Amino acid sequence: MPSRKSKAAALDTPQSESSTFSSTLDSSAPSPARNLRRSGRNILQPSSEKDRDHEKRSGEELAGRMMGKDANGHCLREGKEQEEGVKMAIEGLARMERRLQRATKRQKKQLEEDGIPVPSVVSRFPTAPYHHKSTNAEEREAKEPVLKTHSKDVEREAEIGVDDVVKMEPAATNIIEPEDAQDAAERGAARPPAVNSSYLPLPWKGRLGYACLNTYLRNAKPPIFSSRTCRMASIVDHRHPLQFEDEPEHHLKNKPDKSKEPQDELGHKFVQELGLANARDIVKMLCWNEKYGIRFLRLSSEMFPFASHPVHGYKLAPFASEVLAEAGRVAAELGHRLTTHPGQFTQLGSPRKEVVESAIRDLEYHDELLSLLKLPEQQNRDAVMIIHMGGQFGDKAATLERFKRNYARLSQSCKNRLVLENDDVGWTVHDLLPVCEELNIPMVLDYHHHNICFDPAHLREGTLDISDPKLQERIANTWKRKGIKQKMHYSEPCDGAVTPRDRRKHRPRVMTLPPCPPDMDLMIEAKDKEQAVFELMRTFKLPGFEKINDMVPYDRDDENRPAPPVKAPKKKKGGKRKRTTDEEAAEPEEVDTAADDVKDAPEGPKEVPEEERAMGGPYNRVYWPLGCEEWLKPKKREVKKGKVPEEVEDEGEFDG
């Protein structure tokens, strides 16, 4: 059997290496046929049938070696011979790669000698359209790189049999526009500076509010919030009865038994119980807000999970009527305003029928939720549903027409509550105001969204131009015509955000008030929720700021905590010995002393009544500084790792 070196030498002979492209080195030889590859390179084909057969045999031999077979197709013996075959295959592939690289260089040189223009960058898709963004014809001629294709070259390609002539057009994926050459962050930072108003709505007479979640109550034990939810799979699983139906559910010891017959009413009951727990906590949130001067709250859209789902959806009445009516009664007594904000997928202007149907179901669900609160007439009128127009779908005018048609399909109760909001992507105040005036829909102004998405033909970035009295009057009239108290939204971008994408993210807390009327209902959209409202109240000394005090880090005195365990008296150490008569007489005194030790044990914390739980305690300690959200939870115990004795470490090194 020939050795590995002899085979490698045979594969690396000049004849085998140059067999494929030997004709290219002979200038007197006729130019071989060229076929266009996908990459745009013209690779010369073998001109000799003998060379093609040799290449085929070499490839088959390499493939056989990789599969453990020899040139005749017989299986090689395992062991050293098979290992040598793998190494030979790897070496052969490396040589093939080197030959391909050399052939490419020769082919490129041949094309240059033939006078065929070679583009420096060849697109994978040479026919991709190229659209330049120049403002006039002169700039376009000066900036566009033009690679002309000579007619002689086209005729030459036709003669040699090329099917598709490569047009040397600059590819859209490889040409960098002058406008796009600048980094996105630099473009954002280089935009015209914002022009802000110096007006502050002081003294403040309006209502400040936050959205959905109270961070202080959410971290109470047990937590108080109204957005408990579940997965769709949980609803499906809970259609099966529990393993032990007479015992309460447990995530490990008593789970739904999928071997039992499913019942749809059990799945509905599971998700409805979540909704009822959410609705019950509204009362606690309203009482907490009243104590600290907050009388404006946005209810969570996730209060009743999957209520608008096409399959697992359900009506809120009658199972939630009583709980929601109780929440509405408390809100009416305290004079609080409640609103909702359906999600971003609620789009009446979508061209997709299923999206529109889902949006209508979602709006009907929110309307039923607000109606079951049974609020007084004016408060019920002020309980609005705010939505965005959504996507533009390539044509703003067509989207607006679809919105008008689908708006007409809503029930009158939904129409009475629907409000449009300008967004930070594509719909400006000037886009929405005409349709709001036409359809008698109130428009809520979001200052933060306006600073990102506005019409430069009418306004500049900032709060000054948007505060124009004529424009503000048009916005206010959309509310007055329906007798609804106007509201606005305010938030600020995070520090260091310059691109539109980064600027959309809300800062944890806002630093100032917008130039709105001093009696406005202002929704503060910030990550820190009620703490952002507290920050404004403290900064501008708004009514109620004196009630708010700082928390004690990691300690809350408004929760019931378990009493500390009573330590048993320590027994005196000593060996057994015979007692004397005097010691036996003193024995009763020792017993009394031990009993006194038990009586003097520290008392546990006083029990906090349910109505005072998580309300801030006697000193109203509910404020946590910016970035100190961990104060809301008990401090984590630090586990100190004991040192391992050196003897043990030494023994471990020699364990086998």
Swiss-Prot record:
EC number(s) reported in the record: 3.-.-.-
Residue ranges annotated as compositionally biased, kind Basic and acidic residues, are 48-82, 135-146, 550-561, 596-614
Q: What InterPro entries does this protein's entry cite?
A: UvdE, Xyl_isomerase-like_sf
List the GO biological process terms: mitochondrial DNA repair; nucleotide-excision repair; response to UV
Per the UniProt record, the lineage of the source organism begins with: Eukaryota, Fungi, Dikarya, Ascomycota, Pezizomycotina
Q: Write out the biased-composition intervals (Acidic residues).
A: 583-595, 647-656
Q: Which organism is it from?
A: Neurospora crassa (strain ATCC 24698 / 74-OR23-1A / CBS 708.71 / DSM 1257 / FGSC 987)
**One GO molecular-function entry:** endonuclease activity
Disordered: region residues: 1-82, 119-146, 175-194, 241-264, 492-515, 550-620, 636-656
UniProt-listed PANTHER family: UV-DAMAGE ENDONUCLEASE (PTHR31290:SF5)
> Which named protein is this?
UV-damage endonuclease
What is stated as this protein's family in its record? Belongs to the uve1/UvsE family.
Biased composition range(s): Basic residues: 568-579
